[in-house]
Amino acid sequence: MDASSTPGAIWVVLTVILAAIPIWVCHMVNTLWLRPKRLERHLRAQGLHGDPYKLSLDNSKQTYMLKLQQEAQSKSIGLSKDDAAPRIFSLAHQTVHKYGKNSFAWEGTAPKVIITDPEQIKEVFNKIQDFPKPKLNPIAKYISIGLVQYEGDKWAKHRKIINPAFHLEKLKGMLPAFSHSCHEMISKWKGLLSSDGTCEVDVWPFLQNLTCDVISRTAFGSSYAEGAKIFELLKRQGYALMTARYARIPLWWLLPSTTKRRMKEIERGIRDSLEGIIRKREKALKSGKSTDDDLLGILLQSNHIENKGDENSKSAGMTTQEVMEECKLFYLAGQETTAALLAWTMVLLGKHPEWQARARQEVLQVFGNQNPNFEGLGRLKIVTMILYEVLRLYPPGIYLTRALRKDLKLGNLLLPAGVQVSVPILLIHHDEGIWGNDAKEFNPERFAEGIAKATKGQVCYFPFGWGPRICVGQNFALLEAKIVLSLLLQNFSFELSPTYAHVPTTVLTLQPKHGAPIILHKL
């Protein structure tokens, strides 16, 4: 370039920059002030109430809410009437308490409309195209994306391929794996018993290991040992994420850090191990040697059929990367959900021995001292009532959020694009207007005639979601919980330890913050 042309080029660059500055400023003013205030006016015109929007360039409000939540969780509460919502769901609880059920709260620059009306909830769950999930947090790629995060045609394709893995006939073949893993845990507990046949055990870590072992066996079968290594890496990834989640620096995930580097290394290890297992299985499948008696085998077989049915379409089946994401999701969803369900069940049955006795009597009537079988599990009415009630009081997830990408009518509301709707599962499950004056108490009797009768036909009970996107693994989780609970009731009676501190908290699921110490008595 000629030296004389250099000043001209510099002036061109400076002119472009100077012209871009006012455009950028206008964009930021609109994003940070004009648009939020416009959305707020629209919501107030609909009769919704909430705090006024305030411009905040830091995370002071989120930090304040987190502080309130941490202070609340620093003290234990009683189990007789457990109103856990103020402790673990501070923003929604305070908003509803202050403004009523027709209200909204702010999450950054986006207003979040709190939906508690069963008819509106039904509409949100059913119209999955109109109410998609919000955009992924950048950290999600380090844990799992998979089915729960996909939308539209991609979600429909993955759901179709995954569904066969969770058909009841397939799950029936996995019952021996459930029983085997549970018997191993029971043997460990029996080894801890004193001479009088009792011991105190924090059952929470044992139940986490149990459900991890079950997923390893049922997801990978013959590749169980390799699967267990992958799940150990996923556990380490989860711990790394927990140390990073409190980083409040804006755009933190765009900056280099030790935590981010460690998570990338773990992700590479997970990917390499999973890819090795999948490649071997795919090779065996093509040669006709593969079995489909575990989740991965069924998934690959279903994917193979999908690809074979439309060989000319690149989008027919799942890629290897997508199969890996679904395998990670099997672990995260299957392990955490069932472990938490079993922990809360033992806590509540330890507190309510009359229900424990009724459940044990039923289990012994149906199975005696034999291993639970598929046919008998369907006859466990009391056990099912107990599990439903535990899931009502302690659902795995405490809320669901959906985003509006276009103006929509929801019931009598006209909601503009840019708004989010939040379904506060925990608040609805504990609502005295729906469940009666004992809504915060443990009373499985409310489910004596099933869910439809208990809810009066309303959409107000959804521990696994509802509608087309209801959790594909709910039958897996409930079958596993029934088998484990049946085996425990056959072998032990148990009570809540005096050292137990009741502090529900959310990590990936709603779980006991300080564990679940239980006193076991051998039967």
Swiss-Prot record:
Positions of heme binding: C471
Subcellular location: Membrane
Subcellular location, principal: membrane
CC per GO annotation: membrane
GO biological process, alphabetically ordered: 11-oxo-beta-amyrin catabolic process; glycyrrhetinate biosynthetic process
The entry's keywords: Heme, Iron, Membrane, Metal-binding, Monooxygenase, Oxidoreductase, Transmembrane, Transmembrane helix
Family the UniProt entry places it in: Belongs to the cytochrome P450 family.
Name of this protein: 11-oxo-beta-amyrin 30-oxidase
Organism: Glycyrrhiza uralensis
